[in-house]
Amino acid sequence: MSSPIRRLFVNGFPSLYGGAGTELHHQIIVWRKMGVEVHLIPSWDYHGEPLYNEMVSLGVIMHAPADWSAVQPGDPVLGFCNAGFLNALPEIRRHTKRTVFINCMTWLFPREKEAMQKGEIAMFLYQNEAVRQEAMPVLRKLNGDPQVQFLTFRPYFHAESFPFIRERDEDFFGCGRISRQDADKFAANTLHIYGAFVSPVEKRGLFLGFDKRSEAKIGRPFDWIRIARNQREVSQQDFYRHSRIILQPTDTTCLLYTSPSP
C-alpha cells in the first residue's frame, strides 16, 4: 500500500468522537500505513489530547498551533470541516497553493463561500457523490475557475478498533446517541422520541456528548438515560457495546441505526 503523495499537512487534531475528528483519526492511520509523512498543525495546545500518545507512536509530526513555517510550496494542506482552516487560508497560501477543504456537513459555510470567491481553496473533497453534486454548482457560481477541483473519496474506517459485538446483556434494552454537544446536533423533541418507544425489557439510554448546551436545547434527560460529556467519560467502544439501537434525531435529519443481531 503506497501513495504518490509523500507528505501532507492537516490543520487540526484528531479525536475519538465527533465526525471530522474521528475521520481524521482514521485517515491518519491509513496514511501512515501508506508511508505518507503526516504533519499536524493544530489550532490549540494539543499535548493533553487523548490521541496525543497515539500520534507520537504513529510517527506523526506535530507543530506548534498555527505555525505554518514548515509548509513548502507544493505541500497539500487539508482542513476537515475546520473553521480555523478557512480563516487561516490567506496565511496558508503564502506558503502553498495546494489547499484542500473537506466539508463533512451537507451545507456550505459562509466563510467557505467567501474562500471560493477569492480562489483560496484549490480542491474540495466530499464523502459521497450526492453531496458533491449538491455543493459543486453553488460554489461554481461563485468562481468559475476550472482549476478548482471537486472530488469524492472513500473515507477509511479502521474496523480493528471496533470488534463485532455478538452478545449483549438481555436484562435491558440499550439505546443511545453519540455526537458533539452542540445544540444543532440535537432535535428539540429528542426526549419525546426516547420516552415514546417501547421495549419488552427495561430501557437504558446513553448520551455520549452532552453538556449545558445540549441540555438547554432538549432539557434534562430521564433518570434512565446516562449522560457523558465526552469520550473521556465513555469510550466509543463502550457506547456501541451498550447500544442495541441508536436514535439520533437532529435539527436536519433523523437517523436510525440498528446494531446487528446474533
Regions found by a protein language model. Give the residues of each.
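A short, glycine/small-residue-rich beta-strand->loop->alpha-helix junction that serves as a flexible
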Residues: G12-E23, A183-K185
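Donor nucleotide-sugar binding/catalytic pocket of nucleotide-sugar-dependent glycosyltransferases
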Residues: W107, E120-F164
